[in-house]
Amino acid sequence: MKIISNNSTNIDGVKLIQFERFMDHRGFFTETFRGSDFINKDLNLFPNGIMQSNESFSHKNVLRGLHFQWNPNMGKLVRTIVGHMVDLVLDLRQDSPTQGKIMAFDMPAKPTSISSSWIWVPEGCAHGNFFFEDTY
């Protein structure tokens, strides 16, 4: 896995992480997770290990409402495999300097894209998605 960039956002702790896809005439290959790559980029996002892994498919014009976890709190690493979604993040943390702030991240992904992005949604933040086309 090759992380190309790691950028902070206007919400404390929310990161936009871009990673490389390996392309050739057959399509693309992506190593979806390698813990050491996150640590090498000072992205220690999983101090307790990865707790859960999910995938979804959503049809065009679907809205998946704001989701968050309590007891235990859980951060989320969100990406589009193929399709187009906007991910919304809302900071619900009472002790956060960005409490109440909401951001939208446009996350299109085509099979021919040489890179793709994740949004890191830290514990205490809610997120939801709107899908502009059928999306994996």
Predicted regions and their residues:
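Non-catalytic, conserved peripheral segments adjacent to functional cores
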Residues: M1-S113, E133-T135
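Ligand-binding loop in jelly-roll beta-barrel domains
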Residues: G124-Y136
